[in-house]
Regions:
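A well-ordered secondary-structure block
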Residues: 92-181
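Generic N-terminal leader/processing signal
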Residues: 2, 45, 176-177
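Short, conserved catalytic or interaction motifs in soluble domains
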Residues: 20
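Short, well-ordered surface patches within globular domains
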Residues: 26-103, 156
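C-terminal motif of bacterial Sec signal peptides marking the signal peptidase cleavage site
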Residues: 16-17
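Alpha-helix boundary/capping residues
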Residues: 9, 73, 77, 146-149
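Protruding loop/beta-arch "assembly-hinge" segments enriched in small, turn-prone residues
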Residues: 23-28, 176-180
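N-terminal secretory signal peptides and thylakoid transit peptides that target proteins
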Residues: 1-13
Length: 181
């Protein structure tokens, strides 16, 4: 659901993990106006999917517990000041934090799909894939990307982050649901 890594990238990530100590994930931040608007636009599309029997919940509830993980990803682009970026060893060290978030979240939630960041190329190049927009056509594609992971239909929560790079706002999101529900 979060950024998936190729075998070579995973190996670099494992090497990066060996050097750093673990710290507990920070508390999620309150949503910005853009993030709240984005969730409203996503829910408009999500409702149509619910009406068509394609998802289990009529609306997604904004829950920023997973934002820390997607904020790590977005932060790599913000720090690099470029929407297309070749991952460095330093970036890989930062990505270790995603594993910490995932372990923490998986105690409580099952994780669904995500959208907004490409898979790494063979050269470790990644890109922000969705410029911020609340237009139906753009949001439809964004939701379709989230739905590419089949279990996303069970989602009841969404975390979003809108990184700003070179004066443009982008959007990243992931969905999840309670394990015990």
């Amino acid at each position: 659901a979060f950024l998936k890594l190729s075998g070579a990238a995973a190996a670099l990530l494992a090497l990066a993990a060996c050097g750093g100590g673990s710290s507990a994930p920070a508390a999620p931040s309150a949503p910005t106006g853009k993030e709240a608007e984005l969730v409203a636009a996503i829910n408009k599309i999500w409702k149509k999917k619910f009406d068509a029997g394609l998802v289990d919940h009529e609306q997604l509830t904004l829950n920023q517990e997973a934002q820390g993980a997607i904020k790590i990803q977005g932060g790599i682009f913000e720090d690099a000041k470029e929407p297309v970026h070749t991952l460095t060893t330093e970036d890989m060290k930062k990505l270790v934090g995603i594993q910490e978030w995932q372990i923490s979240l998986e105690k409580k939630y099952d994780l669904g799909g995500a959208a907004g960041i490409s898979e790494p190329s063979a050269e470790f190049e990644v890109s922000l894939t969705f410029e911020y927009s609340c237009e139906d056509a753009v949001v439809q594609k964004f939701v379709d990307k989230i739905m590419a992971y089949s279990l996303s239909r069970e989602a009841e929560f969404i975390s979003v982050y809108c990184p700003v790079v070179q004066g443009k706002t982008y959007m990243i999101a992931t969905v999840f649901w309670n394990k015990t529900a």
